[in-house]
Design a protein with these regions (language model features):
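Metal-dependent amide/peptide-bond hydrolase catalytic core
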Residues: 1-201
């Protein structure tokens, strides 16, 4: 899932009229702590505030601040629960003991990609793939990646789907990300044999 929220405060001079301002950045900071605390590794729910922006000038109490949030969850109900938590955080003023009309938050929440839940059909496809891997002498394992995939959309409508048949690598989405060139041939062989066998069924 994903969310975007924009906090609206009230601009004022950071020196001469500090007390008259309502810092959107300050409120955003409080909300970010609450949002990040939603992460629970035991249940598989992860939340990441990945992009933050705001403010107009160093000497101006910020009238506006924005954050983009990524949400991952293994069970659909967890997504709905997280959405409710987001709405509660967005609806409260956390950084000032004032009426909520002085600081407001606009939010957009989109549970756009369901979790990819195994089915008997996808398990059968996986079993065939692992068997082919063994025949080719490949050490192939399975794991929950926490990744977002179009495969979750196809699987949700009944099409058994496997992910991660491409090259292997490490350090995804970081400056350490790298692919293992030698795995390209191995994975191509695996995919070719799998497609051939499925076509023959």
């Amino acid at each position: 899932g994903q969310a975007r929220f924009v906090v609206h405060g009230r601009a004022s001079h950071a020196g001469g009229a500090h007390e008259e301002g309502r810092s959107a950045i300050k409120e955003l900071a409080y909300k970010i702590v609450e949002i990040e605390n939603m992460t629970n590794y035991e249940t598989g729910v992860t939340v990441n505030v990945g992009v933050v922006s705001g403010g107009e000038a160093r000497n101006t109490i910020s009238p506006c601040a924005e954050a983009l949030v990524d949400l991952r969850y293994p069970d659909p109900q967890q997504g709905l629960d997280a959405r409710d938590q987001f709405e509660g955080i967005f609806g409260d003023v956390l950084s000032y003991p004032i009426e909520t009309t002085e600081i407001t938050t606009d939010s957009w929440i989109n549970l756009h990609r369901p979790p990819k839940i195994p089915t008997p059909e996808s398990d059968n496809l996986l079993t065939k793939t692992l068997a082919i891997g063994r025949l080719l002498g490949l050490d192939i394992g399975t794991t929950d990646s926490g990744g977002g995939t179009d495969g979750s959309l196809s699987q949700a409508v009944g099409l058994p789907t496997l992910d991660s048949l491409g090259s292997s690598g490490t350090g995804a989405h970081s400056e350490r990300e790298q692919g293992v060139v030698s795995s390209l041939v191995e994975r191509a062989q695996l995919s070719a044999v799998l497609i051939q066998r499925l076509a023959a069924e």
